[in-house]
């Protein structure tokens, strides 16, 4: 789960991280009073969406102006006008895709005198099962370009969970960032605070870009992006309260309410599978035979007719889907239950695209019999390869 920048900064502030004072604005008429509560003489007006690249982004609507989603104002009135221009508009960045995201929140914060822009992130390194630090002296809007063209400017290391974080980790970050004097001590404390927040709040990713050195020599968190482990949210009610469902894919949101693991992709063949490994194998074989999967959808081991029906609704709500492949291995899940769910779903949604079903495992013969006697136009797949070839042929011809 992701949260907005202003929420991330409030969380980090509670852990002692140095951040600018700011105000969130939901309505245009709130902007002037919000900006007036801040000191100036420079105000930063930021669009709040769950995507990076806001500074280099562009709005679809000409009324929003030609600048990106991060703008500078030199007066309260100008800050209010910039907020008014961006609220309700659609911001397109390299992370949103061409459809962009609607800006429903604006964050106005005090400007900072910047001497240097740095990069600092904490990530879960799944290869080592440790928390890793990733740091660079080249922070700011071009960090992706730095990673691609000059990777030697990025330093990373992990923390052994058995021994935990120590001061030397903070000093290692400081030296990698080229900090000196009192800045090293500040960095050591900041690293401690960020690491504690990361662990206590079950984060998956914490990105500070940029971490700035101000002209007075002090450090400040200028932007923050935080992602949390969805599997740990049950023990983080305060984090769950920060969830903004308007920022989530509607199909993924609907799937989560039925405990379906769904991720939208860009292809034309919808997939419904039980088990993450089998789902990935199904997507691979669709690509092998010349097509592209439209989604990852794992119905899990305890799917009911209701869950299967909802899964079909979610898949068919994607206008790019030109065919559907159902691939079920019945272990915990019985194939006859899945078959009943498929029939009910096809009847309820009025399926208009080809459907190939491959069943194997517990009660597979009952499942096949239910589908065969349904009177519906469902194509049976004898095995995974056969099913994949049939759905690709049905879609591509």
From Swiss-Prot:
UniProt KW keywords: ATP-binding, Ligase, Magnesium, Metal-binding, Nucleotide-binding, Tricarboxylic acid cycle
UniProt KW Nucleotide-binding keyword: yes
Ranges of residues in domain ATP-grasp: 9-254
Gene Ontology BP term (one): succinyl-CoA metabolic process
Catalytic reaction(s) noted: succinate + ATP + CoA = succinyl-CoA + ADP + phosphate; GTP + succinate + CoA = succinyl-CoA + GDP + phosphate
Function summary: Succinyl-CoA synthetase functions in the citric acid cycle (TCA), coupling the hydrolysis of succinyl-CoA to the synthesis of either ATP or GTP and thus represents the only step of substrate-level phosphorylation in the TCA. The beta subunit provides nucleotide specificity of the enzyme and binds the substrate succinate, while the binding sites for coenzyme A and phosphate are found in the alpha subunit.
Subunit composition and interactions: Heterotetramer of two alpha and two beta subunits.
Protein name listed in UniProt: Succinate--CoA ligase [ADP-forming] subunit beta
């Amino acid at each position: 789960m992701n949260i907005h920048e202003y929420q991330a900064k409030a969380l980090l502030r509670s852990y002692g991280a140095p951040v600018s004072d700011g105000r969130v604005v939901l309505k245009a008429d709130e902007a002037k009073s919000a900006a007036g509560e801040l000191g100036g003489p420079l105000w930063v007006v930021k669009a709040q969406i769950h995507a990076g690249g806001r500074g280099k982004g562009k709005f679809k609507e000409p009324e929003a102006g030609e600048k990106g989603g991060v703008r500078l104002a030199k007066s309260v009135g100008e800050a209010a006008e910039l907020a008014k221009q961006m609220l309700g508009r659609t911001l397109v960045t390299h992370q949103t895709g061409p459809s962009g995201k609607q800006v429903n929140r604006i964050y106005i914060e005090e400007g900072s005198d910047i001497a240097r822009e740095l990069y600092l992130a904490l990530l879960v390194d799944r290869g080592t099962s440790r928390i890793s630090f990733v740091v660079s002296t080249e922070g700011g809007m071009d960090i992706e370009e730095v990673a691609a063209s000059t990777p030697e400017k990025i330093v990373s290391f992990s923390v052994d969970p058995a021994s935990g974080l120590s001061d030397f980790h903070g000093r290692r970050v400081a030296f990698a960032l080229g900090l000196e004097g009192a800045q090293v001590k500040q960095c050591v404390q900041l690293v401690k605070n960020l690491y504690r927040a990361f662990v206590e709040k079950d984060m998956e990713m914490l990105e500070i870009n940029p971490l700035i050195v101000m002209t007075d020599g002090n450090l400040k968190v200028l932007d923050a992006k935080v992602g949390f482990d969805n599997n740990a949210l049950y023990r983080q009610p305060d984090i769950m309260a920060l969830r903004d469902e308007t920022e989530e894919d509607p199909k993924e949101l609907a799937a989560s309410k039925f405990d379906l693991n769904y991720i939208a992709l860009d292809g034309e063949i919808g997939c419904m599978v039980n088990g993450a490994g089998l789902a990935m194998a199904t997507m691979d074989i669709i690509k092998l035979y010349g097509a592209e999967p439209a989604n990852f959808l794992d119905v899990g081991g305890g799917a009911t007719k209701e869950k299967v029906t909802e899964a079909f609704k979610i898949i068919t709500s994607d206008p790019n889907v030109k065919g559907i492949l159902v691939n079920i291995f019945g272990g915990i899940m019985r194939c006859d239950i899945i078959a009943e769910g498929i029939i009910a779903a096809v009847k309820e949604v009025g399926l208009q695209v080809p459907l190939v079903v491959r069943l194997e495992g517990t009660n597979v013969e009952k499942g096949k019999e239910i589908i065969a006697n349904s009177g519906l136009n469902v194509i049976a797949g004898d095995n995974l390869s056969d099913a994949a070839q049939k759905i690709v042929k049905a879609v591509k011809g």
